[in-house]
Amino acid sequence: MVPLALGTQTVGSVLRPAAYCGAVGFKPTHGRISAVGVTPLAWSLDHVGVLCRSVEDAALALAIMAGHDPGDPHSAAIPVEDYVAALAAPA
């Protein structure tokens, strides 16, 4: 299996396949990852999501893809956290 695959989550299109295949599916908060280039079924529902082998891979993918995109009117202009470091932090 590849370490990372992208998909769009409208009605379970990331989370369900991940669950069926024993992978990690992650749907970030709407606007966290740019949706430029995505053909939406509904702007309010479609999210870019990732399918990965592990939570660590998902955190790394989010760290790389997250951030404000001025070309996406729904993109959130908020700082990107260090998601990989957050995994190592005590609970």
PLM feature spans:
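Active-site-proximal alpha-helical scaffold in enzymes
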Residues: M1-A19, L51-V55, L62
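A short helix-breaking turn/cap at a secondary-structure junction
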Residues: K27-A91
